[in-house]
Structures are given as structure tokens and as C-alpha cells.
Amino acid sequence: IHYAKRMPSISYAYGLFLNNILVGIVSYGSPVSPSLCKGIAGEINKKKVIELNRLVLKYNKKNEASMLVGKSIKLLPKPKIIVSYADTKQNHVGYIYQATNFLFTGTTKPRTDIAGKNGKHSRHHLGDKTKRVFRSAKHRYIFINANKRERKKLLKQINYQIMEYPKW
């Protein structure tokens, strides 16, 4: 079970099998925020953006995660700009993304969201039945899944600075 405990939008999902038993899954889908798509590489490229939104492994053996991510990217349609996040609250740095040559583009700002009394995120104003829930900073990674020429072109259109990988 994934720690986020919510079902994201899933457009593509790939499994990792060991002796015909599912032991891992990676999924990709539309990012929750349309403004995120536009913010990454502009209006012209917003439909190319997808999010690696879940990665779950039963055993989490050495290199298992990066192998699953790397092989699944090869199965995605091109060109795509893949964005994913490593949650600092979970002590994630993003080593999987670093191992699969994602580009590090900084860390989001911590913030608070409005949630209902049950603690779940709400996009609706619920009056006094709401509370503020802390959302931790996340490391943002992107991967340009395209041929060499398209990749070079898309890299020039990325709106974020490419930075050194974070380490812990």
C-alpha cells in the first residue's frame, strides 16, 4: 500500500513480476494541477506532461525500483515530459530518479491545504468544518522521454533551472 492512500489519475501502469507474481507497480497519469503542466515547459508543451504518480514495491530489493522505472519509461509514448516528486516528509531524496537520469529541478515550498474534518484534501470551501493540513516540501524531478533532437528542443523550453542532485 502506498503511503499517500489516495488513487491518482492513471493513464499508464506497468507491473514487475517475480515467478508470475506481481511484486511491484509504477503508474503514470495526468498531474492534478493543469497549471503544473503549463509551468514546466509552457503552454505549447503542457499536453506532453505526465506524472509518475505511484511506485510501489513488495520487497524493494536493490535496483528493483530504478529498473522498473527505467524499463517502464521505454514503454511510454514519446515525446513526454515526466514529472515526479520525492516526499521529504517520508525522508525520500529521489535516489530512484537520480539512478534513472531524471533531472532535479528544485524543491517545492512547504504549504498548508484546506481539509475537511476527516483530514482529506478539499477543493471546496466547507466553512468552519475545515482545518489546515501541512504539506511537506517535495523534491521535483523531470525526465524528457523523446528522441535526441526533440529532447534537446524540449530541454530548452523547461521553465525550471536544472540543479545538482540533493544528497542525504
Predicted region positions:
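Acyl-donor binding region in acyl/amide transferases
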Residues: 29-133, 143
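Short amphipathic alpha-helix that is part of the acyltransferase structural core
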Residues: 1-9
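Short, cationic low-complexity segments
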Residues: 152-168
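Conserved beta-hairpin
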Residues: 11-27
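Short hydrophobic/aromatic beta-strand or adjacent loop that forms the aromatic wall/cage
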Residues: 11, 136-141
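C-terminal accessory regions of radical SAM enzymes
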Residues: 143-152
